[in-house]
Every structure is written in structure tokens, then in C-alpha cells.
């Protein structure tokens, strides 16, 4: 498999996981990263990449709280 093919697959996985996160937040409201990681049941690095995607696109708000992060959807 070429690097491009690997990268395309990874982008797809990040996008799908970002969608799962968005739907979870839409149904459950504000959650901590720990709660989200348990609910989504994907590798943490993939969840972090997907959160980065959503944050960069302006879809979520991340706030550091002690040793965790609070995550919520940005409601316009």
C-alpha cells in the first residue's frame, strides 16, 4: 500500500470517528474526554485526531479542567 493510500484511509477513519463524536455530543451534551473515550471505544490517538479536526472546523469547544478536558458542541 502506498503512503497516499494509507493516508487516505487514515483521513477516512478520522472523519468517521469525528462524526461519531459529533453525534455523541449532540445526544449527551458536555462530557469529559474520559467519558467520551469510554463511549466511543476507539484508540485514544484516533479520538484526539478527530477532536482536533472538529476543533479546527469550529464544531466543538475544548476546555482543560484539572487533569481532563471538557468537550461540548459549539452551538451557533
Task: Please place each PLM-identified region on the residue numbering.
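Short amphipathic alpha-helical interaction segments
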Residues: 42-53
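Short loop/turn and capping residues at structural boundaries
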Residues: 36, 48, 65-66
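Short, cationic-aromatic polyanion-contact patches
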Residues: 3-18, 32, 64-76
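Short amphipathic alpha-helical interface segments
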Residues: 14-39
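Residue-level detection of the helix-turn-helix DNA-binding "recognition helix"
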Residues: 26, 52, 56
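A short, conserved structural fragment
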Residues: 55-65
Amino acid at each position: 500500500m502506498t503512503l497516499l493510500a494509507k493516508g487516505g484511509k487514515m483521513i477516512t477513519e478520522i472523519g468517521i470517528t469525528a462524526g461519531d463524536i459529533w453525534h455523541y455530543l449532540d445526544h449527551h451534551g458536555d462530557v469529559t474526554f474520559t467519558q467520551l473515550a469510554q463511549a466511543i471505544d476507539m484508540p485514544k490517538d484516533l479520538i484526539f485526531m478527530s477532536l482536533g479536526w472538529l476543533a479546527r472546523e469550529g464544531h466543538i469547544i475544548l476546555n482543560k479542567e484539572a487533569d481532563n478536558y471538557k468537550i461540548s458542541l459549539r452551538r451557533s
